[in-house]
């Protein structure tokens, strides 16, 4: 199920900049294995969900998966063939702002080989370079 905030204070946001590295959310907290971002990017709720589904499908019933990012930034898109002006477009989808070092997914309760395979499948769904990390 695609995730987005239940309610926000404002409908639209500035685009912002992604400079520097992530100093929050860059340590493994819940599981034993994790997928860590190496590049800055906006990751859409669809991409997050695709990665989560791929990991869940590969791990079957064993193990537990934690998604450590949440899409809380609305991205607006103007209608096609619209002239300039007349305000900002309407919110179309949600993204999570990810900086280098950020943990995207965590996994526990499975062997390292299973975790490595599942996380590599999820990594292929991501628009950025990532690395497999082991806690400890």
From Swiss-Prot:
Entry-linked PROSITE patterns: RIBOSOMAL_L16_1 (PS00586), RIBOSOMAL_L16_2 (PS00701)
Major localization listed first in the record, in broad terms: plastid
Quaternary data: Part of the 50S ribosomal subunit.
Localization per record: Plastid, Chloroplast
Protein keywords: Chloroplast, Plastid, Ribonucleoprotein, Ribosomal protein
SS bonds (residue pairs): none
Keyword Plastid: yes
The protein's name in its UniProt record: Large ribosomal subunit protein uL16c
Stored PANTHER family: 50S/60S RIBOSOMAL PROTEIN L16, LARGE RIBOSOMAL SUBUNIT PROTEIN UL16M
GO biological process: mitochondrial translation
Keyword Ribonucleoprotein attached: yes
GO cellular component: chloroplast; mitochondrial large ribosomal subunit
A GO term for molecular function: rRNA binding
Similarity field: Belongs to the universal ribosomal protein uL16 family.
């Amino acid at each position: 199920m695609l995730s987005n905030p239940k309610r926000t204070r404002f409908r639209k946001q500035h685009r912002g900049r992604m400079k520097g590295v992530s100093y929050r959310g860059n340590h493994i907290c819940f599981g034993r294995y994790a997928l860590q971002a190496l590049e800055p990017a906006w990751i859409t709720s669809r991409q997050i969900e695709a990665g989560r589904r791929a990991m869940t499908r590969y791990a079957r019933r064993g193990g537990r998966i934690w998604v450590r990012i949440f899409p809380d930034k609305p991205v607006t898109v103007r209608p096609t063939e619209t002239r300039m002006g007349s305000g900002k477009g309407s919110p179309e989808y949600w993204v999570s702002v990810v900086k280098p070092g950020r943990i995207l997914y965590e996994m526990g309760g499975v062997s390292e080989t299973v975790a490595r395979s599942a996380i590599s499948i999820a990594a292929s769904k991501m628009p950025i370079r990532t690395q497999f990390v082991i806690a400890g």
